[in-house]
Amino acid sequence: MVLGLLAFIWLMRAWRQSLKIWVDVPSIGKDGILGQWITALQWQQKARSLIQEGYEKHGHYAFKIATPSRWEIFICNEKMIKEYKNLMDDKFSANAVTADMFQTKWTAPGAAEGVHKIPIPLLAKALTWQRNRSSVTGDTYFKEFVTEFLHAWEVETKITSEGPYEFCCFETGTRIVAHLTAKSLVGHPLCRDPEIIDLFAGYGNAVPSSGFLIAMFPGILKPLVAKFCEAPKMSDRLDRIFLSEMKERQLQTGSDASDIMSWLWHWTQENEPGKYSEVDIVRSITSAVFGAIHTTTQVLVHCLFELATRPEYVEPLRQEVQQAVENHGGWEKEGIESMLKLDSFIKECQRFNPLDSGSLARCATNDFTFSNGLKVAKGTYVFAPNAPVLFDERFYPNPHQFDGYRFYRLGQQTGKPQGFRFVATNSNYLQFGDGRHTCPGRYMAADEIRLMLGHILLHYDITTKENEGRPKNWFFKKILFPDMKGVIVLKKRAEVRAVNK
């Protein structure tokens, strides 16, 4: 009780201090000091509607909203967004926002602010190396990836009967994504280790819950609170397992890089020897687990919910998947890339259920002045609107109507299908960010989601539970979550044409 009182007093003091960081843009919510308090208290439940209101009123410029911890500034003007999104961390830091939101100093030290760590561009280089392997003749990586998915499906679903099977989308989806993430990051034998899968699946959910709790307390109490949270314990355990595996691999002379962890070790030894330690590498891998699993699973769950409640898409998408598999002799990378309608359906599911109402989150690490004269003080949190843009009639006709072929048609009409793929970003589609900090793992996420949806479409009929509609989304601050206990019903199809399972 004493700790709670101290935390409350500290939060109120921190809130008052943070509101002193003033930016001269219109405010959304109630006026005056009391009004700011009321708006801040509404943030947890009404953040998305407040951001929508700001966008509708000031979508040509910018606005600010009082939250329990600070003013949050939303930049709507495209020219201003371009000004800040590509700036280096000495002016606007993306990592500082993540570090504060999830308290990564304790929950994910490999992503903490102000520590020596593997830089994101190097991790992106590793992911690019892995992605390129899929198109190299004779490279077995993608076949191994498919094999790992089929193994994960069998282990995690255990569907043996022909009758209806209730499939818990979030729980089972998280664990299957954990298998594939482990395959990518640390490879065999760890990706088949039950403890690793448990840790990967649990860590993806523990980071935000632990981070939100730790953030409620003043700095002097954070280390104590962290000792009672799950994420720091899981992070430490993963670090120790990865470090042991890395040391064992170093004893095996002549082994080539086969996963992200081993690639980082080889690359740093060859190009920057002595700059990064083994601990730096394993901590970067552990930190990557959260980002790789958390958002991928949420998009996957939305896709499953939408597919189960929109039966008109099932047969056309099934035919496209079947044709691609037959044309390429099984699950091949080229075949998955040819599934343009399925890719469009996934992107529309993501557009229709946007994870975050804001994007391009940055913290000003120094005072900054935009070219139009707007001054932003050091410590200011800046965002670009995301959800409001995705439902803006100017960019997406009939935005409140789900259209699974929306992006497929746009690709055909413009003659530029690549610009409308699930992984594509632009100023009106910021789900993966844009600029310097565009999500480097989005290609792997696309493969995971397409594999799982394609497998389900080929092998199962998919519906909702009887007399139940789509499991409802829920909201916390700016974030939209799918129903984590929601289920769909799968039933094995009577006739399934041959495919490598």
Swiss-Prot record:
One of its GO terms (molecular function) is monooxygenase activity. It is found in: Membrane. The keyword Lipoprotein does not apply. One of its GO terms (biological process) is mycotoxin biosynthetic process. One of its GO terms (cellular component) is membrane. The keyword RNA-binding does not apply. It is an enzyme of class 1 (oxidoreductase). Heme binds at residue 439. The chain crosses the membrane at residues 1-16. Its cofactor is heme. InterPro entries: Cyt_P450, Cyt_P450_CS, Cyt_P450_E_grp-I, Cyt_P450_sf. It is a single-pass membrane protein. Keywords: Glycoprotein, Heme, Iron, Membrane, Metal-binding, Monooxygenase, Oxidoreductase, Transmembrane, Transmembrane helix. Its EC number is 1.-.-.-. Pfam families: p450. Glycans are attached at residue 132. Pathway: Secondary metabolite biosynthesis. Cytochrome P450 monooxygenase; part of the gene cluster that mediates the biosynthesis of the indole diterpenes janthitremanes such as shearinine K or shearinine A. The geranylgeranyl diphosphate (GGPP) synthase janG catalyzes the first step in janthitremane biosynthesis via conversion of farnesyl pyrophosphate and isopentyl pyrophosphate into geranylgeranyl pyrophosphate (GGPP). Condensation of indole-3-glycerol phosphate with GGPP by the prenyl transferase janC then forms 3-geranylgeranylindole (3-GGI). This is Cytochrome P450 monooxygenase janQ. The lineage of its organism: Eukaryota, Fungi, Dikarya, Ascomycota, Pezizomycotina. The gene is janQ.
